[in-house]
Amino acid sequence: VDRRQRQMCIRDSLFNQLVQTEQWQQASVIGLTMSDGLEWETRPIIEQAWKEGKKVAVPKAIKKGSQMDFRQIDSFDQVEAGFAGISEPDPDQTRSLAPEEIDLLVVPGRVFTPEGYRIGFGGGFYDRYLAKFDNPTISLVWQGQLTDNLPTDQYDLPVQELLISQL
């Protein structure tokens, strides 16, 4: 099995775990990033959310203050190349959602501890957003992304639940 096939199997395993969680099933609005090749492919998750009648919110980076504005997308046509080449919602075609309007946030990361602490992709965008987000958070993790400890500070907030693929 080549690396790409293995990654697709892991992604599919994590995707299936996610859509079976109580948090997913109870959520009306899902927040998650548009994948850019460094994290798990999120388009199938977004498509599944739409298929189930859920709303989807994806972040637009606001460089000043390293903030994120999650905006509802109803189609991939509402997405454009944004900050650092990452796909982001077009603000002219989408509406901003407040953190409390998002029922479940799927948080990306490179490395995780079993307690949910993470190293992201730099910039602290998600750490700042998590500080004002009170609803459930989940990360999709391959066992190779787990480590026993990471340096943390007072700004680091753990993800509430890790879905871990054993593949």
Identify the role of each PLM range.
Residues 3-4, 100-105, 113-117, 127-167:
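Surface-exposed, charge/polar-rich loops and edge strands
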Residues 11-19:
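Short, amphipathic alpha-helical "lid/cap" segments that border enzyme active or binding sites
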Residues 29-96, 141-149, 159:
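Extended, well-folded interaction surfaces typified by the phenylalanyl-tRNA synthetase beta subunit core
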Residues 21-24:
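Glycine-rich helix-loop-beta junction characteristic of Rossmann-like nucleotide cofactor-binding loops
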Residues 26, 52-53, 131-136:
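Short glycine/proline-enriched coil/turn segments at helix->beta-strand junctions
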Residues 110:
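Active-site/ligand-binding-proximal alpha/beta "capping" segment
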Residues 1-10:
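Single conserved hydrophobic/aromatic residue that forms the stacking wall/gate
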